[in-house]
A protein has these predicted regions:
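FAD-binding core/adjacent interface of flavoenzyme oxidoreductases
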Residues: 70, 94-96, 103-154, 170, ...
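Immediate flanking context of iron-sulfur cluster ligation sites
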Residues: 35-55, 79-105
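A conserved FAD-binding loop/helix module that cradles the flavin
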Residues: 303, 445-472
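FAD-site-proximal beta/loop scaffold in flavoenzymes
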Residues: 255-288, 372-449
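Conserved beta-strand-loop-beta-strand element in the redox core of flavoprotein oxidoreductases
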Residues: 220-235, 280, 355-387
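Long hydrophobic segments that form regular secondary structure
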Residues: 284-321, 388-394, 401-402, 420, ...
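Beta1-alpha1 glycine-rich phosphate/pyrophosphate-binding loop at the start
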Residues: 11-35, 64-76, 86-87, 114, ...
Length: 472
C-alpha cells in the first residue's frame, strides 16, 4: 500500500510499531537502540495519518512542524519535498525525531493515540532527514543574498544552532563560539549515544558549515575573548549558553565521596566512549556498584541507562511522585525498566547515609500526593514514620539544572530574574531581545532547563528578532 491509492483503514491495518534491539544486545554498547524505517515502512506508517481537520499534533509541537503535510509527502514517496518542509520549521529535525518526548507532545496529541496507537511521528521525522541527507539532499541557500551583517552566537547548543540556521538563510553571517571542542553542547556531551548518535550532531555541523556558518570552538567568552570585543565587532549578539549548574537536594550527605552530579557523570562517560581527551578522574565507572539515581526526569533516565551499560550491580531510580506524574519521557521509563532499572516511586530522599565520609545509602521517606502546586502538579507529602535506607555505593543527583550566568552580564546590562534566568522582551516587541538592545537570548538561559525542541524554537524566534533589529 506504500505508494498506491490511500487506504482509509490504514490506521487499523498497519500497527504503530517502532522496532528496537533486544535488551541483551543493547546493554553491550552505547549506540542507538531503535531501528530506522526503510522507505516502505516509513510510507506505511505515514499513511496511517487520517489528516485531521484540526491537526493537534502540529499545535502541540513547540516549533509547530507541518506534520500532516510531511507525513503525506512521505506516504507518496516524495522524500526530498518532505525534507525541505521539515527543515522549514525545525533546524534540527533529525535530532528532535530521536530525543523529543513525543509521547507528551505530537504523538500524545495524535487523534489515533487513545484507541489505535499514535502515528510514529518521531520515527518518520528521523527517517526523513536521515535518508534525505544520506541521498544528498541539502538545504538550498543558493538564492540567499548576503547582507554584510554579522552576528556572534555564544553557545553551539540547540538554541545557538537554530539561531545560526535562521540567520544564514536570511543572508546574515553567524559566527558561533563555544567553550567545548565539539559542536552541540548537551546534544554532544549530555545526551548518551544510545539516544543520540554523535555522528548525527557532527553531520548537522557539517551542513551548517556548508551553508556558511562559522564555528570557533575551544573559546570561552569572558576568558579567551572579552564580550566587549563581540559588541564592537558584530552587529548583534545571541546568548545561548544553556544551563549547566545542577540543582542540589539540600539534604545531609550530598558532599560525601561517591555522590556525583548527573551532568559530570554523563559528560565524563560520553567523552570516554567517544575517545575524546579528558581528565581521567572525570570518568566515573559504575561497574559492580550499587547505584541510586535521584530524580525522575530525562536526565535521570540517561543516568540509570548509562549505569546499567557500565555493568552496575544494581540500579535504583528514586522519585518523589508516582510514575504518572514523573516529568520524563514515558518511553525512556519503559526502556529503563526493560534494561533492569528498579524504580522506587513516591520516595523523597532526606539524607545520604555515610560511613567514614563515603556514601553507603540513601535514606528516603515514603510520600503520598496531596493538592496541586502552583504549576498544577500534585505536591508529594511525606508519610510519617516511613523512612527507610536504600543501600548504595554511588549516588547520582539528577534534580535538574539552572542557569549560571557569568559575571560580565552585569557589566553589559543583561538582566536576570531571581533564579538567574536571562530576561528578554524588556524593550518592546523584538523577540528574544534583552535589556541591552544589541543582545538577544533564548533556550534554557531564558526558560530554565527545558526540552531541546523548545530551545530550537527560542533560537529561531530570537533570530527573527535579530533580523528585525538589523532591519533585514
Amino acid at each position: 500500500m506504500s505508494k498506491s491509492a490511500k487506504n482509509p483503514f490504514q490506521f487499523l491495518d498497519v500497527p504503530r510499531r517502532v522496532r528496537k534491539q533486544p535488551v541483551a544486545q543493547r546493554l553491550q554498547h552505547h549506540q542507538e537502540i531503535y531501528h530506522g524505517f526503510d522507505a516502505d515502512r516509513a510510507a506505511d506508517q505515514a499513511g496511517r495519518c487520517i489528516a485531521c481537520g484540526n491537526p493537534y499534533c502540529e499545535w502541540k509541537c513547540p516549533v509547530h512542524n507541518y506534520i500532516p503535510d510531511w507525513l503525506k509527502l512521505v506516504a507518496e514517496g516524495r522524500l526530498f519535498e518532505a525534507a525541505e518542509l521539515s527543515n522549514q520549521t525545525n533546524s534540527l529535525p533529525e535530532i528532535c525525531g530521536r530525543i523529543c518526548p513525543q509521547d507528551r507532545l505530537c504523538e500524545g496529541a495524535c487523534t489515533l493515540n487513545d484507541g489505535f496507537g499514535a502515528v510514529a511521528i518521531g520515527a518518520v521525522e528521523k527517517y526523513i532527514s536521515d535518508t534525505a541527507l544520506a541521498q544528498g539532499w541539502r538545504p538550498d541557500v543558493s538564492r540567499v543574498v548576503p547582507t554584510g551583517k554579522r552576528v556572534a552566537v555564544i553557545g553551539a547548543g540547540p538554541a545557538g544552532l537554530a539561531c545560526a540556521d535562521v540567520l544564514i538563510r536570511n543572508g546574515v553571517q553567524p559566527v558561533v563560539f563555544d567553550r567545548y571542542d565539539e559542536v552541540g553542547g548537551l546534544l554532544m556531551f549530555g545526551i548518551p549515544g544510545f539516544k543520540l548518535d554523535k555522528e548525527v550532531v557532527r553531520l548537522r555541523r557539517q551542513i551548517l558549515e556548508e551553508m556558511g556558518v562559522e564555528f570557533r570552538l575551544n573559546t570561552e567568552i569572558g576568558r579567551d575573548l572579552p564580550f566587549e570585543d563581540l559588541l564592537r565587532d558584530y552587529d548583534a549578539v545571541f546568548l545561548g549558553m544553556g544551563t549547566y549548574r545542577f540543582v542540589e537536594g539540600g539534604f545531609p550527605g550530598e558532599q560525601a565521596r561517591g555522590v556525583f552530579p548527573a551532568l559530570r557523570y554523563l559528560i565524563g562517560n560520553i567523552r570516554h566512549v567517544l575517545g575524546l581527551p579528558d581528565n581521567e578522574e572525570n570518568y566515573i565507572d559504575m561497574a559492580g556498584q550499587r547505584v541510586v539515581v535521584l530524580g525522575g526526569g530525562d536526565t535521570a533516565m540517561d543516568c540509570v541507562r548509562t549505569a546499567v551499560r557500565q555493568g552496575a550491580a544494581q540500579v535504583h531510580c528514586v522519585y518523589r511522585r508516582d510514575e504518572e506524574n514523573m516529568p520524563g519521557s514515558r518511553a525512556e521509563v519503559v526502556n529503563a525498566k526493560e534494561e533492569g532499572v528498579v524504580f522506587l516511586w513516591n520516595r523523597q530522599p532526606i539524607e545520604i547515609v555515610t560511613d567514614h565520609g563515603a556514601a553507603v545509602g540513601v535514606k528516603a521517606v515514603e510520600t503520598e500526593l496531596g493538592p496541586p502546586d502552583a504549576n498544577g502538579r500534585r505536591r508529594p507529602q511525606p508519610i510519617p514514620e516511613s523512612e527507610a535506607v536504600i543501600d548504595a555505593d554511588r549516588v547520582i543527583i539528577a534534580f535538574g539544572f539552572r542557569p549560571d550566568p557569568p559575571e560580565w552580564f552585569d557589566t553589559y546590562g543583561i538582566e536576570r530574574d531571581a533564579n538567574g534566568r536571562t530576561l528578554t522582551g524588556q524593550n518592546g516587541d523584538l523577540r528574544g531581545q534583552t535589556a541591552n538592545p544589541k543582545v538577544f537570548s533564548g533556550g534554557d538561559m531564558v526558560r530554565g532547563s527545558d526540552l531541546v525542541v523548545t530551545a530550537v524554537f527560542d533560537g529561531r524566534e530570537a533570530a527573527q528578532g535579530i533580523l528585525d533589529y538589523l532591519d533585514v
